[in-house]
């Protein structure tokens, strides 16, 4: 792990819908940001950690949501290093590094 200010720099990967904004189930233009969560993401970025955003937007429809999502994130003031589209659509994710967004220490 790299060091930032004497601390380990980590790579954080955040989902978008239902994590840093409301889940609108495909009506992404209506999503509303969770300001306190975005502030936390930005603090991690400012502390030297790598912030990646990972979304399933367009996975099932084939619609390219990159430009709209980038514009939306900029409007919300989200700081990040990489936006990754193509997250598989699933009802349940089982992952050894996953943390439920409702349980995360925002």
Placement of each model-derived feature along the sequence:
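Catalytic phosphate/metal-binding cores of nucleic-acid and nucleotide-processing enzymes, i.e., regions
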Residues: 1-106
């Amino acid at each position: 792990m790299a060091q930032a200010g004497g601390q380990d720099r980590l790579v954080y990967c955040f989902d978008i819908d239902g994590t840093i904004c409301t889940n609108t189930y495909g009506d992404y233009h209506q999503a509303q940001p969770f300001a306190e969560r975005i502030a936390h993401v930005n603090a991690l970025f400012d502390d030297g950690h790598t912030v990646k955003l990972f979304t399933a937007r367009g996975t099932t429809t084939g619609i390219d949501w990159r430009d709209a999502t980038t514009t939306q994130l900029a409007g919300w003031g989200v700081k990040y290093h990489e936006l990754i589209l193509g997250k598989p659509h699933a009802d349940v994710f089982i992952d050894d590094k996953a943390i439920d967004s409702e349980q995360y220490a925002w």
